[in-house]
Amino acid sequence: MDPTTRSLLYDRPDLYELVFPDADDALGTMCRTAFERYLPAPPRSVLDVGCGTGRLLEVLSTTIAECWGVDYLESNVAYARRVRPALLIRQGDMRAIRLGRTFDVVGCFGNALSYALTDRDLERTVETFAAHAHAGTLLIVDVLNARCYLDGDGFQERIEGTVDTPAFRATSVSIHSLERMSRRLKRTRVWHIPGQPDVQDYAEYRLLYPHELRQLLKAGGFEVAGMYDNRQFKDTDLAGSISAAPDVGGMRGRKLYAFARKR
């Protein structure tokens, strides 16, 4: 993760699930569908690289015996261990961590791979995926879709969002800019929280085209079995499907989802 990255939600991981609720279990449903499609038998182990608060792992733990997570941020690791003590959570850099074992499923969600800004960062992260995979392991990753941002109408300079829950109320304004040569998206987000000083986030993300993601995974020993720009496995031209709804993250409908098996 770039050292200039800062986020209210990294400082306060307890707020993450309020800001980004998953009441309909969309991500868990996608994963379970992928297991049925791309694995010969139900998985017995899963590693989530960039696991955040461990919410997805907790969902998957109802049917998967061994659920491991890795996150770069000590704040996320501490929160996940406190709230979800049954999970096996480790702190580490996705470019370098080695757990000394393999898993039936390796996942990397929430744009975590998009934090790998350079080609070498991307390669090293995929090497981490491969180090924890055996032949037939299913890899599931999502990244920000360069087609949507650079070629289509997915780029919006200014996006507003609202969080209105009993525990947390705030509005946000996200300002985006593109570096086309390096295929990077930069986002500055300002939180307006009643009765508190404004809080400013900053992040940079690497944008990947579908063919780049496919080649990256192939070079790391994975064969892509499916790639979509949605969680419903609908075949499209991978240009991205844009939501017009207010969006705190500013990235809804702008992702690629890849499903690949270790050779």
Predicted regions and their residues:
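Conserved class I S-adenosyl-L-methionine
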Residues: 1-50
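A short glycine-rich, Lys/Arg-flanked "PGG" loop and its adjoining helix->strand segment in the class I
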Residues: 123-135
